[in-house]
């Protein structure tokens, strides 16, 4: 009896395993190999195809690069085959575990049913000894199958965990490599941008250093003596102010000196006096208190002549052109030179106004009629000298 039961269970198990295996083979497209019906042509084709089925059968008449490529190709193919066989084995184990679990569940249900029938059946007390023995054998065998199915399920779970961990680790490593490459690329781009910025800032720094050096040279070449003379020439309303501030070399080397033409230059051209080769003409747009309409009567235009020993400004006041060029090297004209605010600022820093109509208060002025107009001379020029010196000192402190 026991032998028959053992054989029966073995046959059932083999049939179930065979069905599961055949089902998986059909699922993955694995067909049994048949050698019948093969001719010589197909055999030769198979032999030709199987010449390079693995990296061990690579022909020696190919180059090293091709051999290396074939080795890598076959290695990748072998890895793919191993993965496929591993997946098939895992699937087969899972199917076997599922079959075992189903069998265990059926056995447990049968045991429960038999126990219930034995307790409540009419023949519960009159069962034979062989029947009870068969029930015990079935219970033991079903318990064994259930334990085996449980072990198979645990193994499947462990295999799945290993495979998933391997895949997750590979994905994490690939992500880290891509992030490192991205960080390196960003670092390279930042370094290139910083180098470009430093290269663009270098010329500006050099020009600033050149500008400061020229200012230092200009400040070192200044003189403190200021001479104010009263013009006693034949032309009326003419004043000459001589301020030896710069040397000729400093004035000519000044890169910020510009020659600006007066707005009235087309109508009244400026005069150019060149007693020395290094003198140059310079006309500007800076007004002073002496060039206002209240002080200036009607007179021709004005000009400034720059000499090697200083700066000589000859001002001819005129009602139409309220301009005065005082080029001492301490300032240069820019794009804000011809605005109202800049003119007011220069007027506030210039010498105090001297009104010709106040005879009692301006005791230092003397009127004389000669030539073709009224000529005013001042015996004492201390006020004008102090104003010019203060203006130059303020310009120097500003620079």
Swiss-Prot record:
It is found in: Nucleus; Cell membrane. Residues 130-158, 159-181 form the IQ domain. Residues 285-294 have a biased composition (Polar residues). May be involved in cooperative interactions with calmodulins or calmodulin-like proteins. Recruits calmodulin proteins to microtubules, thus being a potential scaffold in cellular signaling and trafficking. May associate with nucleic acids and regulate gene expression at the transcriptional or post-transcriptional level. A motif (Nuclear localization signal) lies at residues 1-8. This is Protein IQ-DOMAIN 25. It holds the Pfam family IQ. Keywords: Calmodulin-binding, Cell membrane, Membrane, Nucleus, Repeat. Residues 81-91, 99-110 are annotated as: Calmodulin-binding. PROSITE patterns: IQ. It comes from the Eukaryota. GO terms for cellular component: nucleus; plasma membrane. Binds to multiple calmodulin (CaM) in the presence of Ca(2+) and CaM-like proteins.
């Amino acid at each position: 009896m026991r032998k028959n039961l053992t054989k029966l269970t073995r046959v059932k198990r083999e049939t179930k395993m065979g069905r599961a295996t055949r089902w998986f083979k059909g699922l993955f497209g694995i067909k049994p190999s048949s050698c019948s019906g093969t001719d010589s042509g197909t055999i030769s084709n198979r032999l030709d195809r199987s010449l390079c089925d693995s990296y061990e059968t690579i022909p020696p008449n190919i180059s090293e690069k091709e051999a290396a490529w074939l080795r890598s190709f076959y290695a990748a193919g072998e890895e793919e085959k191993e993965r496929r066989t591993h997946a098939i084995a895992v699937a087969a184990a899972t199917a076997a575990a599922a079959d075992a679990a189903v069998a265990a569940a059926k056995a447990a249900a049968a045991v429960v049913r038999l126990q219930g029938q034995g307790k409540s059946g009419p023949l519960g007390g009159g069962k034979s000894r062989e029947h009870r023995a068969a029930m015990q054998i079935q219970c033991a065998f079903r318990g064994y199958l259930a334990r085996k199915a449980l072990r198979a399920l645990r193994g499947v779970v462990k295999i799945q965990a290993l495979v998933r961990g391997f895949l997750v680790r590979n994905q994490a490593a690939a992500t880290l490599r891509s992030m490192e490459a991205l960080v390196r690329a960003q670092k390279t781009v930042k370094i290139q941008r910083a180098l470009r910025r430093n290269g663009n800032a270098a010329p500006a720094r050099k020009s600033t250093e050149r500008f400061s050096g020229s200012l230092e040279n200009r400040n070192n070449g200044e003189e403190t003596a200021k001479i104010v003379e009263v013009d006693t020439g034949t032309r009326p309303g003419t004043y000459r102010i001589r301020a030896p501030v710069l040397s000729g070399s400093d004035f000519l080397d000044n890169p910020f000196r510009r020659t600006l033409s007066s707005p009235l230059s087309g109508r009244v051209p400026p005069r150019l006096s060149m007693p020395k080769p290094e003198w140059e003409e310079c006309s500007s747009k800076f007004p002073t208190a002496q060039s206002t309409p209240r002080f200036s009567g009607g007179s021709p235009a004005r000009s400034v002549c720059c000499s090697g020993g200083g700066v000589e400004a000859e001002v001819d006041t005129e009602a139409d052109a309220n301009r005065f060029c005082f080029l001492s090297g301490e300032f240069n004209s820019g794009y804000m030179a011809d605005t109202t605010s800049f003119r007011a600022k220069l007027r506030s820093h210039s010498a105090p106004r001297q009104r010709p109509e106040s005879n009692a208060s301006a005791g230092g002025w003397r009127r004389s009629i000669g030539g073709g107009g009224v000529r005013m001379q001042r015996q004492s020029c201390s006020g004008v000298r102090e104003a010019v010196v203060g203006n130059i000192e303020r310009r120097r402190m500003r620079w």
